[in-house]
């Protein structure tokens, strides 16, 4: 009988398997070969060097990813898997052993002019496919530290930024507050924001604020320290600002970000009207209180077993495209999905490629509700993206954060739109539309407030240390600008900077705008599909395939979209405006 567990045999049958052992041994050999080739760069032609090093870089990528993915798959389904933890440590050490040699090769590639690169690659498909990869490597090298700077920075980061990250995680995971006689963690309290009982939601929010007040001091030190480290590192690397570095890593122009936020600001009043309408429907007159943002509305008695979920998803996706539906069918049929929650398995959901197999794996915690079906469809969208790029060269499979959620959000739009159109009652339709708008309003209003907060913090941190009260003031100002009169401003959450892990990374600053970009890009693509029909499909697949090789602007251009102007974003927001109008109509009827 199917127990809902994935099959990993296409990767490895175990850590003691011959294949796992041979791949570990081969990775060690590749490390040595890369080291040897790095010493031979001087005195050979660019063509000779590329022909010698690129295949090794490809093999290193394939081996290290396959080995580490298998460890991840094992660890995330069984936290007590000691063999997986041990193997993961060995894999990480082996994967990083060639870092210096790979850095030298990257610097060498960066030293070659574009003209010399073109001449060296001529007639070699195995090299010409990486023209854009080499371009990006040349750009990245301009921001590398000289001498032993990279090694020194990495070592200091362990006791610097990485330790401050751990402090924030430690404080937020350990703090508790009593609610109705029970000591609850911050995560447990935040999850009660979805409780059907309004009094529970309010009490949980008040307890949540008390948690933040207990830990705000050390977490403020963590935030200040991480941001100062990011600012200092950006100065050393030649970036104008922390945001400048973030956009560089995303392969995205500042004009595109400005166009996105410009369109969002135009439509903020529309989203404020959604919050006010929800507040009025729940009996509030001065806007929606913060603790009611996730208050459920409408209802549905519909539940799904995993076979019904499979049938529903495949049916909806087949309306759009046979290949997309077939990919989903195969994932179910060949046990690529670990379905149910169990002891030792992590929460949430993710999709990862199974490198070297042409497959992917999905972890989810399916509970039978429609939201769980949507989560499955979302992750299958990631899987479809992976299937589109699986034939790319090994070095052409990493895409940037802004486009990472495109296919997954597109799948969500397909599924939720179908569900709304086929709702069995107005109450079910209200639930579906309100859930969609909850997510959309977070992508627009909440993410914008996070962006404004981080931008202000980075600007102030250059010459001042911000105590908790100042950080709270910045957060409140950001929320007032983003949420306007849609929320009851006396109930705003000044401590949102404490709990959001996205602020606490020296590697990924401004881990916010990609959510807005991805969400609105997917909705805009869905609207384009509704207009173009079957003609849209080849462009959509080509766009997904090219995301690792092109900038976000050029990727979107394949579908005839200009993301550097406001018009496209206005179209996405206009579609959401129609959803808001439908929501208002339904709550008035109710």
Regions found by a protein language model. Give the residues of each.
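Post-HExxH zinc-binding segment in Zn-dependent metallohydrolases
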Residues: 400-428, 436-438, 442, 518
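Long, K/E/R/D-enriched contiguous segments that form extended
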Residues: 277, 281-325, 351, 385, ...
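Conserved helix-loop functional segments at active or binding sites
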Residues: 319-326, 352, 382, 386-393, ...
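A well-structured
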Residues: 1-298, 310, 585-589
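Catalytic zinc-binding patch centered on the HExxH motif and its immediate surroundings
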Residues: 299-304, 337-358
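Active-site recognition of the HExxH zinc-binding catalytic motif
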Residues: 238, 367-387, 408, 413, ...
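Short pre-active-site segment immediately N-terminal to the catalytic Zn-binding motif
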Residues: 302-306, 357-377
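C-terminal, non-catalytic "cap/extension" segments appended to globular domains
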Residues: 2, 105, 109-110, 135-140, ...
């Amino acid at each position: 009988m199917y127990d809902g567990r994935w099959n990993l045999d296409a990767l490895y049958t175990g850590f003691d398997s011959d294949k796992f052992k041979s791949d570990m041994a081969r990775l060690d050999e590749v490390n040595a070969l890369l080291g040897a080739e790095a010493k031979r760069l001087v005195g050979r032609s660019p063509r000779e060097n590329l022909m010698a090093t690129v295949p090794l870089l490809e093999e290193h990528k394939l081996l290290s990813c396959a080995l580490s993915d298998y460890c991840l798959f094992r660890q995330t389904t069984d936290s007590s898997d000691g063999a997986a933890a041990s193997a993961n440590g060995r894999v990480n050490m082996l994967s990083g052993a060639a870092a210096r040699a790979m850095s030298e090769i990257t610097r060498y590639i960066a030293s070659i002019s574009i003209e010399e690169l073109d001449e060296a690659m001529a007639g070699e498909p195995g090299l010409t496919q990486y023209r854009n990869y080499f371009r990006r490597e040349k750009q990245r090298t301009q921001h590398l530290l000289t001498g032993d700077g990279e090694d020194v920075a990495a070592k200091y980061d362990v006791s610097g930024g990485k330790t401050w990250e751990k402090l924030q995680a430690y404080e937020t995971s350990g703090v508790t507050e009593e609610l109705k006689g029970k000591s609850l963690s911050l995560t447990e309290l935040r999850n009660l924001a979805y409780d059907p009982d309004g009094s529970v939601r309010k009490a949980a929010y008040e307890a949540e604020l008390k948690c933040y007040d207990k830990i705000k001091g050390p977490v403020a030190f963590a935030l200040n320290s991480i941001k100062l480290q990011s600012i200092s590192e950006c100065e050393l690397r030649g970036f104008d600002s922390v945001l400048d570095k973030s956009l560089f890593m995303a392969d995205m122009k500042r004009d595109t970000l400005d166009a996105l936020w410009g369109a969002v600001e135009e439509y903020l009043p529309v989203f404020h009207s959604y919050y006010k309408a929800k507040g009025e429907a729940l009996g509030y007159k001065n806007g929606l209180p913060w603790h009611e943002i996730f208050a459920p509305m409408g209802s549905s008695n519909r539940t799904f077993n995993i076979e019904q979920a499979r049938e529903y998803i495949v049916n909806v996706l087949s309306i759009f495209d046979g290949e997309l539906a077939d990919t989903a069918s195969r994932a179910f049929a060949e046990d690529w999905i670990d379905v149910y929650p169990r002891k030792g398995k992590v929460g949430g959901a993710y999709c990862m490629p199974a490198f070297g197999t042409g497959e992917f794996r999905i972890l989810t915690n399916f509970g039978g509700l429609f939201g769980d079906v949507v989560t499955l469809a979302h992750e299958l969208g990631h899987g479809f993206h992976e299937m589109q790029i699986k034939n790319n060269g090994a070095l052409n499979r990493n895409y940037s954060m802004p486009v990472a959620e495109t296919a997954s959000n597109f799948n969500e739009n397909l599924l939720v739109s179908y569900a709304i159109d086929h709702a069995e009652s107005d109450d079910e339709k209200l639930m579906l539309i309100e859930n969609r708008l909850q997510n959309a309003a977070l992508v627009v209003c909440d993410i914008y407030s996070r962006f404004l907060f981080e931008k202000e913090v980075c600007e102030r941190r250059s010459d001042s240390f911000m105590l908790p009260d100042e950080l709270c003031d910045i957060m409140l100002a950001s929320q007032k600008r983003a949420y306007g009169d849609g929320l009851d401003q006396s109930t705003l959450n000044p401590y949102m900077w404490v709990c959001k892990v996205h602020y606490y990374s020296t590697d990924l600053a401004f881990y916010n705008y990609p959510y807005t970009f991805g969400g609105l890009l997917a909705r805009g693509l869905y609207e384009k599909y509704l207009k173009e029909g079957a003609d849209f499909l080849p462009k959509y697949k080509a766009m997904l395939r090219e995301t690792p090789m092109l900038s976000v602007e050029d990727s979107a251009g394949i579908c005839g979209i200009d993301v550097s102007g406001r018009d496209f974003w206005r179209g996405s927001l206009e579609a959401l405006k129609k959803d808001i109008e439908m929501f208002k109509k339904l709550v008035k009827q109710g």
